[in-house]
Swiss-Prot record:
The protein's assembly and partners: Part of the 50S ribosomal subunit.
Protein name as annotated: Large ribosomal subunit protein uL15
Gly residues bias: start-end ranges: 21-35, 42-52
One of the GO biological process terms: translation
PANTHER family for the chain: 50S RIBOSOMAL PROTEIN L15, LARGE RIBOSOMAL SUBUNIT PROTEIN UL15M
GO cellular component, one term: cytosolic large ribosomal subunit
Length: 146
């Protein structure tokens, strides 16, 4: 086989559909768009959500609520996720991101009390649940609010 003998695989190169080139082609006159009207025109059709003049669904339904721009969003972590650290480690939000325990520290980290902790850790975070504080201190660790 030589370079000039190479051919594309069967069906790899599909010829473009040539429309509006005579009735004998089967796609002449209306070019496969049916009879004339809004949808047969270039750029024709209605905008998304338009229901033919009827009040559209997105306007029939009431608006509700608002976005509180002062809301704090904390990255929540349960205690059992902290067992991946060695005894005596100082666990900070930066370390949690580095070890991929949490993807992103938003407005801080909140430690929740689900699961058990077997390691003696010093945990620094923005918020703690009451049960998390009890369990960390029961394991011999320390809690620091930053």
């Amino acid at each position: 086989m030589k370079l000039h003998e190479l051919r594309a695989a069967e069906g790899a190169n599909k010829a473009s559909k040539r429309v509006g080139r005579g009735t004998g082609s089967g796609l002449g006159k209306t070019s496969g768009r049916g009879q004339n009207g809004q949808n047969s025109r270039s750029g024709g059709g209605v905008r998304p959500g338009f229901e033919g003049g009827q009040m559209p669904l997105y306007r029939r339904l009431p608006k509700r609520g608002f976005k509180n721009i002062f809301a704090k969003e904390y990255a929540a972590i349960n205690l059992d996720r902290l067992n991946c650290f060695e005894d005596g480690t100082v666990v900070t939000p930066e370390l949690l991101v580095e070890k991929r325990v949490v993807k992103k520290v938003k407005d801080g980290v909140k430690i929740l009390g689900n699961g058990n902790i077997e390691k003696k850790l010093t945990v620094k975070a923005a918020k703690f649940s009451k049960s998390a504080i009890e369990k960390i201190e029961a394991a011999g660790g320390k809690v620091e609010v930053i």
